[in-house]
Amino acid sequence: MAGRTVTRVDLCEAVYQKVGLSRTESSAFVELVLKEITDCLERGETVKLSSFGSFLVRQKGQRIGRNPKTGTEVPISPRRVMVFKPSAILKQRINANGAMPMSTEESDENTAQSASGG
């Protein structure tokens, strides 16, 4: 289900096309918004964008993991992770027209997994 990847440049171009700011102003605007979101998350704040979703930071405690190659137990340090929770409106919009058709590659992967029992 991999689609096109949208980059910062694409976002800046969209602002330029739809808002009417210059390309320089559009780029500065996008960078400012992304910096503000980043700064809030670094401070541990939740960023809630109505009708879109929320970005939040969760604290994960130390735990014991396992090295997949050797099977030996290894400690995993406590850390903070960023989580995105989409809003119900965004979920509805994404699923409004049913599931997107799978790419050929994804279809082949699912077929191979089904055949192998996994």
From Swiss-Prot:
It comes from the Bacteria. One of its GO terms (molecular function) is DNA binding. Transmembrane segments: none annotated. Keywords: DNA recombination, DNA-binding, Transcription, Transcription regulation, Translation regulation. Pfam families: Bac_DNA_binding. Residues 97-118 are annotated as: Disordered. GO terms for cellular component: cytosol. GO terms for biological process: DNA recombination; positive regulation of metabolic process; regulation of DNA-templated transcription; regulation of translation. Belongs to the bacterial histone-like protein family. Heterodimer of an alpha and a beta chain. This protein is one of the two subunits of integration host factor, a specific DNA-binding protein that functions in genetic recombination as well as in transcriptional and translational control. This is Integration host factor subunit alpha. The gene is ihfA.
